[in-house]
């Protein structure tokens, strides 16, 4: 079994800014701990420090039992086999690479044959073939096909949820006793989230996960570790009691700070009074020096930790008037995904697109954003003055990857730097203005994408899982912004809380039919792959 022990950890960003300080906590054997906190607060960085991908500025990290790591984002240029290998133990990754090199160098010479035989032996000793048996079970459960049939299949042909489910199966069934999971519920449909909650409850592995899904946190986490203001604090209870515990802690910190301020003011007044008296009476000089010393020591110790600052994110999506029919679909059929369906979307409607992973929801939004990008039959038309803006589920934006937020806004929208900074500040992104897009946290990338949609003035919002990487405050700000938006919204979501405020629901059924519903219908069965 395994555990995680973090002691007095500190980490500074490459530009020297401190991100984490005096971070200490322990996740004991079999515990399920959740890291929560604002986007960009350091949750993913903390996971990377524990995984050994980053070196701390100070402090120590100790783990036992082997680490299985799921990252927040997965490169799309891998095969299914490479996707599974990415969450395998290091010794199996090394043995697999050595075997591939030996196989590539194989000739008729006895030396190369001996090297190949040794590589096979090393792969066996590392547990490679045993793990492939596990992977076979994973692909059979997640994709409905054995490993040998899908190992060379491009992972990009799987939905985001299918990729997540596959990696989670591998980690939960694998040999590592400690799991670090960064947003494991992202892209999972409702049955997938329910499955993950049940598996986390049942596993004997030690788990440290990052999530903003309140239902998953309530059902799977037995302790909450909050990352905010550069450090952490631990709530030993579950998520049900966490909001009250956080309010109580903030009130306690506020009271301690007020007491410190009062004592600081009292000591300063005392020093001031004694200094005046000492000028006229030498007998008071010793009392004056003692008071100065006490004040100096008090100030050197410093004030207590301040209460955490609440986020103030202000989304100002504008939109604009369009034709009455914003979207018209006639006998539309997404190739190999849906049966033909008709749809009319009226100006101003808010429609949530629901259904299981792989049912075609994301492809439908992609089609509306760019009809030439998705194979289909039938017709799809956008109404007069309808300008689509597409929020991409996986945040795959090659056009933004190496660019900084301030440069993106000033260049793409012709604004001044001051205007760009004001816009970034409304989204709590001003501190990241000079960070390349690919270095931002998932939540920061999501907020920046929403800001870019706002600045574009698009009149049709196509949002693919927009709340997946957003913390609770950011998700609420987005919801408030959509309420005030003067345009049309279609949003793919598996977030039941987010979906409650929509006007109607477009449901992609497991059998390929697509229908409209006045109430949310959460499908309980995933589609069979290939159907």
Regions found by a protein language model. Give the residues of each.
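ABC ATP-binding cassette signature C-motif
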Residues: 1-253, 321-531
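Non-transmembrane amphipathic alpha-helical segments
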Residues: 95-103, 119, 260, 264-274, ...
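Short, flexible active-site-proximal loops enriched in glycine and acidic residues
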Residues: 109, 262, 303-306
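A short, surface-exposed helix-loop junction/capping segment
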Residues: 112-122, 268-278, 310
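Alpha-helical segments in transporter systems
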Residues: 120-123, 284, 312-318
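ABC ATPase nucleotide-binding domains
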Residues: 253-274, 278, 282-293, 525-531
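ABC transporter TMD-NBD coupling linker
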Residues: 291-309
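Amphipathic heptad-repeat alpha-helical coiled-coil/stalk segments that mediate oligomerization
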Residues: 303-328
């Amino acid at each position: 079994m395994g555990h995680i022990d973090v002691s007095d950890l500190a980490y500074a960003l490459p530009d020297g800014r401190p991100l984490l300080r005096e971070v200490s906590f322990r996740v004991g054997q079999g515990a399920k701990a959740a890291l929560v906190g604002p986007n960009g607060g350091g949750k993913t960085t903390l996971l990377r420090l524990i995984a050994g991908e980053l070196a701390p500025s100070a402090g120590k990290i100790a783990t036992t039992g082997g680490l299985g790591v799921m990252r927040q984002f997965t490169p799309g240029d891998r095969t299914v086999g490479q996707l599974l290998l990415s969450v395998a133990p290091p010794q199996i990754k090394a043995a697999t690479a050595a075997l591939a090199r030996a196989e590539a160098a194989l000739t008729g010479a006895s030396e190369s044959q001996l090297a190949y035989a040794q590589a096979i032996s090393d792969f066996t000793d590392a547990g490679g073939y045993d793990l492939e048996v596990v992977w076979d079970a994973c692909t059979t459960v997640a994709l409905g096909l054995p490993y040998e049939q899908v190992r060379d299949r491009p992972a990009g042909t799987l939905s985001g949820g299918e990729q997540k489910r596959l990696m989670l199966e591998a980690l939960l069934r694998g040999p590592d006793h400690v799991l670090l999971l960064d947003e494991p519920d992202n892209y999972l449909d409702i049955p997938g989230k329910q499955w993950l909650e049940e598996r986390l409850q049942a596993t004997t592995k030690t788990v440290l996960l990052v999530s903003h899904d309140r239902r998953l946190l309530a059902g799977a986490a037995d302790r909450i570790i909050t990352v905010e203001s550069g450090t952490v604090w631990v709530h030993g209870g579950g998520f049900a009691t966490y909001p009250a515990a956080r309010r109580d802690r903030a009130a306690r910190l506020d009271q301690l700070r007020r007491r410190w301020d009062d004592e600081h003011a009292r000591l300063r007044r005392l020093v001031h009074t004694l200094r005046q008296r000492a000028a006229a009476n030498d007998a008071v000089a010793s009392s004056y020096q003692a008071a100065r010393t006490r004040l100096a020591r008090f100030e050197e110790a410093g004030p207590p930790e301040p209460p955490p600052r609440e986020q103030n994110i202000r989304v100002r999506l504008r939109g604009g008037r369009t034709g009455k029919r914003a979207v018209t679909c006639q006998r539309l059929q997404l190739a190999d995904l849906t049966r033909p369906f008709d749809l009319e979307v009226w100006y101003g409607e808010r429609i949530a697109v629901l259904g299981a992973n792989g049912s075609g929801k994301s492809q439908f939004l992609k089609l509306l954003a760019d009809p030439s990008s998705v194979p289909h039959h039938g017709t799809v038309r956008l109404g007069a003055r309808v300008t689509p803006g597409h929020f991409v589920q996986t945040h795959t934006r090659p056009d933004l990857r190496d660019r900084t937020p301030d440069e993106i806004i000033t260049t793409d929208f012709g604004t001044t730097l001051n205007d760009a900074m004001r816009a970034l500040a409304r989204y709590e992104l001003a501190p990241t203005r000079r960070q390349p897009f690919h270095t931002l946290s998932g939540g920061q990338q999501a907020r920046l994408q929403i800001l870019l949609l706002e600045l574009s003035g698009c009149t049709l919002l196509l949002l693919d899982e927009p709340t997946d990487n957003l913390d609770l405050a950011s998700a609420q700000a987005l919801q408030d912004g959509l309420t005030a938006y003067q345009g049309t919204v279609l949003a793919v979501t598996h977030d039941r809380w987010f979906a409650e405020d929509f006007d109607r629901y477009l449901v992609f059924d497991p059998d390929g039919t697509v229908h409209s519903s006045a109430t949310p219908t959460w499908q309980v069965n995933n589609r069979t792959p290939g159907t």
